[in-house]
Amino acid sequence: MLKTSAIRLPNPERLMVTWDTGRRCNFDCTYCEATRHDNKSAPHSYQELVRTFEFVKKYTGEQLVNINFTGGEPTVNPAFWQLAEYIHTNETRFRLSLTTNGAWHPKNTDRIAKWFEGVTVSYHAEGHAILKKQTMDNIKLLHDLGIWLQVNVMMHVDHFDECKQICAELKELGIKHNPRPIGDGGIDRKGWFIDSDGSQRRTSHDYNDEQTKWYFEYLGITSPKEGRNCCGGRCVQGKVNDKWQDVNFIDTNFKGWACSVNKYFLHIDQHTGNVYHHQTCQALHDGRRGVLGNLNNTDDIFAYVQANKDKTIICPNDRCGCGMCIPKAKSIDVFKELL
């Protein structure tokens, strides 16, 4: 893995709004914490979702925007489909994409193909056999319809052979897919713990040597590498010894780097109403982490953005769990050249 002193995007990218539309989910994966999903929360109404979209419109101004809907599981809420149709029909500067477990009712496949630019399906081996079959059937249908599609196969340490089989099937079908290790290597999360809802969770999996060997061989990597690649598949360049070159696996220790996360991302948690620059890093200005504000008082959000519009975010995190694919640099002078 190459050590970089700066990251840049060779191609322009739209601002990405990741919108967690609600906690409710039809899966209950042990590696997904209670703060991310449940099976009891009431779905948010169409009116609530439209109000949030009006905030997104105001926040993004005249920019071209990608909205990626996440959850929970977005497709279990009927109001989600109403919102998607409304945006697709009436708002031309927004492109829609969907991150889903893939177990939607087959009647919704045509809606997805019509209203969405692309879909990322996460295959979860812990799901019920009926739901997993539905997921694979839906994946094949979308592939046949020609929509942009990628499948993240969540490589469950206890169901590794099943996950390998799914990868082989997707490869044979010519469907873009990524075997994804579960977790980011957090030592404290590799064991079981009691979550806030009383459930047993294990959010980082500890793979044995044979599993690790299969993973790197499947990716065509001759020796294990630390770091991450972009989960959205973006092309990324790194500055290595003062020269720019394409990079894949990136060292994710950016603490103290100047970062443009606020210019490329916005995250909305519909369940809590909290709004962040980015879902996982939650970086703010002045070396802090936290929320921009809440949907119940968007005036405060706009006041914060206006007060900090000329300031640079300095990464406060020891590790970048996502967001490594946006312009950033160790040197503030190099960073200014990237913008």
Q: Where are the language model's segments positioned?
A:
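Flexible mid-to-C-terminal extensions adjoining Fe-S/redox cofactors in radical SAM and related proteins
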Residues: 1-15, 35, 272-339
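Canonical Radical SAM [4Fe-4S] cluster-binding loop centered on the CxxxCxxC motif
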Residues: 6-48
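The −1 position to Zn-ligating cysteines in a subset of zinc-ribbon hairpins
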Residues: 24, 28, 258, 321
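Secreted/processed peptides and extracellular or luminal domains of membrane proteins
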Residues: 31, 35-38, 198, 204-205, ...
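Short cysteine/histidine-rich metal-coordination sites, predominantly Zn2+-binding motifs
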Residues: 43-53, 335-339
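Radical SAM/AdoMet-radical enzyme domain recognition
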Residues: 50-69, 77-178
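Conserved C-terminal portion of the radical SAM core fold
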Residues: 118, 130-244
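C-terminal accessory regions of radical SAM enzymes
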Residues: 225-288
